[in-house]
């Protein structure tokens, strides 16, 4: 990774994700987290102000040194204890199976190289009654938008840190062994190929579960 990926892209990412619309969406979902939380792709820590007092600890995973540096600063004002893990989400997480009450990922799954493997790690660490809270952009339902998502994704991955515009977020979550219990989809303000959003909650499923 070069200078752009290490130093420029993290600042662009922080700025792009720090606006009224994303703050509104964060405020709708992040307070639903409870107990021990794993935030996958914590980035610069923009979710931290939205965690409720019912969160005891947040484990924040991210591979970017620069984004974690920004997150450390925001963690100082967080209501919960925050511990950072610098690694990719699909790597084996140094957390015990069934030790996490809530997994949170916002605008993250698009950029994980091996998304199915990362989701398996999330499922592994969740308790049986745990929840996955997700806010992700991905493949739109409209053919005229999908055409552009497919055309732009190869270039977008190069300039956007591996971000895919065309991933089917709900299908990825279900295929990893989750049941989606709440799902809202919509276009957020902005260019449609980049802004179709999946927001919701999922729970892990197991063979024989009711």
What are these regions (language model features)?
Residues 16-36, 46-47:
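Conserved alpha-helix/loop element of class I SAM-dependent methyltransferases that forms part
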Residues 38-40, 44-92:
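Class I SAM-dependent methyltransferase SAM/SAH-binding core
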Residues 90-102:
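A short acidic, Gly/Pro-enriched loop at the edge of an enzyme's catalytic core
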Residues 101-114:
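A short SAM/SAH-binding and catalytic strip from SAM-dependent methyltransferases
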Residues 116-128:
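A short glycine-rich, Lys/Arg-flanked "PGG" loop and its adjoining helix->strand segment in the class I
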Residues 129-137:
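Conserved beta-strand signature within the Rossmann-like core of class I S-adenosyl-L-methionine
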Residues 161-177:
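Short alpha-helix
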Residues 185-210:
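Core SAM-dependent methyltransferase catalytic element
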């Amino acid at each position: 990774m070069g200078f752009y990926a290490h130093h420029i892209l993290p600042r662009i990412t922080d700025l792009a994700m720090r606006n009224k619309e994303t703050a509104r969406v964060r405020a709708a979902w992040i307070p639903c987290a409870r107990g021990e939380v794993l935030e996958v792709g914590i980035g610069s820590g923009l979710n931290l102000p939205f965690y409720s007092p019912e969160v005891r600890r947040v484990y924040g995973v991210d591979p970017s040194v620069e984004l974690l540096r920004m997150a450390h600063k925001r963690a100082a004002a967080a209501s919960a204890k925050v511990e950072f893990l610098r690694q990719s989400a699909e790597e084996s997480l140094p957390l015990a199976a069934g030790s996490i009450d809530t997994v949170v990922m916002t605008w993250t799954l698009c950029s994980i190289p091996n998304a199915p493997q990362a989701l398996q790690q999330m499922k592994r660490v969740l308790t049986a009654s745990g929840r996955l809270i997700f806010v992700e952009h991905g493949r739109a339902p409209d053919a005229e938008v999908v055409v552009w998502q497919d055309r732009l994704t190869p270039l977008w991955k190069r300039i956007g840190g591996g971000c895919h515009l065309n991933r089917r977020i709900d299908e990825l979550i279900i295929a990893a062994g989750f049941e989606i219990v709440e799902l809202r989809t919509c276009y957020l303000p902005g260019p449609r190929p980049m802004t179709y959003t999946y927001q919701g909650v999922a729970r892990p499923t197991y063979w024989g579960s009711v």
